Amino acid sequence: MNNIPDDFKKIASSSRLPRKYCSSESSLSDDDGHEIEHVLKHGAPEEALTPDTERMVVLGQDVVQSAPASLVPGGNLSWMSKIKSAGASMMGSIRPSSSSQDVHSTGEIEKHSKKKWKARLWSTWNNIKYSSTWMSDRSDEYGGENDVVFLGRRYSTSVDESGLRSGFENFCSDYYSRLWITYRTDFPALLDTDTTTDCGWGCMIRTTQMMVAQAIMVNRFGRDWRFTRRKRSHVAAHGDEDDFDREKIQEWMILKLFEDKPTAPLGIHKMVGIAAMGKGKKAVGSWYSPSEAVFIMKKALTESSSPLTGNTAMLLSIDGRVHIRDIEVETKNWMKKLILVIVVRLGAAELNPIYVPHLMRLFAMESCLGITGGRPDHSSWFVGYYGDQIIYLDPHVAHEYIPIDINPNTNVVDSDSKKAKKCPEKSYHCRLLSKMHFFDMDPSCALCFQFESREQFDNDMRQLNLSQFIDIDQGEEHGMKRVRDPMFSVVYGERRQPPSYEREVSETEQAQADKHGFEML
């Protein structure tokens, strides 16, 4: 018990059942969900459209960042009614009218308009269902005796001598600096389909992108880098405009790796294209398991010609065994940095409590890239913990796709309104803190690490073995260092040949088997 984190001892002393803590979970009832689905499929009775509901539908990004006050539950008109009203207006716009028979007589125009508005309504529905905008500010839940452990860093949440919560503020800055890659709408169509959004099915791809983006950011800027949104006028006044531009350009170059367009080496178009080699058109709209998403990302990294990814290799283990020989091959004898992903199952139907201290230990490691997993059909990127709750970044928020231009003086203009669009940078950083109970986590997940050298890898694996968290196989000469409840095994020796149970079958045994109708295996 000496190796079990103090945080877990506090959890183990409590006998209460796990509760739901997911701060980005929707408050929709089942009836509300059915009503929305009915609106999506059949439309709703035409009603008056208020200014607030029109703003909610057309400005999809505003729904996420700053919902109108009139949409908050408890107003004069329920937000569900406004959703129906918005749906009625949008669906009504694609129905034939007596004043525009000449327009709707063209079937292709009607079909195109219907697809366009239905896709936008689906995006709005996903925003409502998954956005944490409807939840209250939970920053006051991070107070007391527990520390926040976040991707190898520990932050105190208590008030310091000056009366400030500087530790918690530093955690918020660190959390906000991580790249938050979410659903996108209105990007170029995927493959040869009309699909221009990944809402409802691309969450595991987005989760994997966030994990890899973290590795690239650490390689480029270091773990202590923090995102800043200083204005150019402020930067120019302090004389460091050139340095600011250089850093911003490098940051945007990393974002462009994951941009939602066909030419992005790690974007969703590239990943879906790789998946289509095996799935065909089912690659669009299909859910992906953690191992599938990582396998696709590994191939995308291998095919990437970007200098930002040239020194990075990825190794995926799906059987819970990491072979040092495989690592040496992938990294060319450690000439490249390693992203190591180990797919595990830490329980049958739910997370086994014995693995909670194991996960806590992982989040405290400098080499930790988090965990890709989530709840059933709801992928998330787990990045730390606070007490008995696991902290994560949720991709289930839809943002409008805006092209990324590394020229800081360039504005993107909307083709319809001819107005300049907002800088997309803000949508890649999340201010809303999301967390859930450890036991709400799906036991099927992928443990992610990044190692710069063989020395760092050996040291971390040795510490995990001494903490009774993993097995180490040192080869046939030196034997195994086993633990009671390992998450995975590291094999340093040559690949062991599985035991062979084959032997020659005698004529008598074969005759007996034939007589009784058995097959000799």
Curated annotation (Swiss-Prot):
What molecular function terms (GO) are annotated for this protein?
cysteine-type endopeptidase activity; protein-phosphatidylethanolamide deconjugating activity
Q: What is its EC number?
A: 3.4.22.-
Q: Which GO terms describe its cellular component?
A: cytoplasm
Q: Does the keyword Protein transport apply?
A: yes
InterPro entries, A to Z: Papain-like_cys_pep_sf (IPR038765), Peptidase_C54 (IPR005078), Peptidase_C54_cat (IPR046792)
> What is this enzyme's catalytic activity, as reactions?
[protein]-C-terminal L-amino acid-glycyl-phosphatidylethanolamide + H2O = [protein]-C-terminal L-amino acid-glycine + a 1,2-diacyl-sn-glycero-3-phosphoethanolamine
**Compositional bias (Low complexity) at which positions?**
90-100
What coarse category fits the chief subcellular location reported for this protein?
Answer: cytoplasm
Region feature Disordered, mapped onto this chain: 90-109, 499-521
Does the UniProt entry include the keyword Transport? yes
Q: Where in the cell is it found?
A: Cytoplasm
Coiled-coil residue spans: none
Keyword terms, alphabetized: Autophagy, Cytoplasm, Hydrolase, Protease, Protein transport, Thiol protease, Transport
The UniProt entry's GO biological process terms, in alphabetical order, are: aggrephagy; autophagosome assembly; mitophagy; piecemeal microautophagy of the nucleus; protein processing; protein transport
- Catalytic positions are 203 (nucleophile), 394, 396
Per the similarity annotation, which family is this? Answer: Belongs to the peptidase C54 family.
Per its database record, what is this protein's job?
Cysteine protease required for autophagy. Cleaves the C-terminal amino acid of ATG8 family proteins lgg-1, to reveal a C-terminal glycine. Exposure of the glycine at the C-terminus is essential for ATG8 proteins conjugation to phosphatidylethanolamine (PE) and insertion to membranes, which is necessary for autophagy. Its cleavage activity is functionally redundant to atg-4.1, but it cleaves lgg-1 precursors less efficiently than atg-4.1. In contrast to atg-4.1, plays a more significant role in the later phases of autophagy and in addition has a role in autophagosome maturation.
- What name appears for this protein in its UniProt entry? Cysteine protease atg-4.2
Give the organism the record lists.
Caenorhabditis elegans
Gene for this protein?
A: atg-4.2
